[in-house]
Amino acid sequence: MNVNFTPRAWYEYTGWQLEDKKTLKRINAMIKDIERNGNTGIGKPEPLRSDLSGYWSRRIDDENRLVYKLIGEGEARELVIFKCTTHYE
């Protein structure tokens, strides 16, 4: 599975690398879990609604969320990370 970040999500992800290694480890664990289990697993995955229909969210901690979308099936499946900080905007 390919893992891609939007420019904003990559900026947020690299910010965690500098600011909080514990949170970064949690994000990395979630990404691995998504690769293995899809839309089930750690972080209380939930589908988003309205404008964000088709996206999923997982709780990094009380304040921050990992927002992502799985595209495709099988070997061609792609994980796109849209956000890895505070609630949806």
Each model region followed by its residue ranges:
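Enriched for short, Lys/Arg-rich terminal
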Residues: 2, 11, 15-24, 58-65, ...
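Short alpha-helical linear motifs
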Residues: 29, 49-52, 68-71
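PIN/NYN-family metal-dependent endoribonuclease catalytic core
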Residues: 5-6
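A short, surface-exposed loop/turn module that caps and links secondary-structure elements
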Residues: 32-58
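PIN-domain endoribonuclease scaffold, especially VapC-family toxins
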Residues: 24-32
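A short, hydrophobic secondary-structure junction motif
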Residues: 31, 37, 85-89
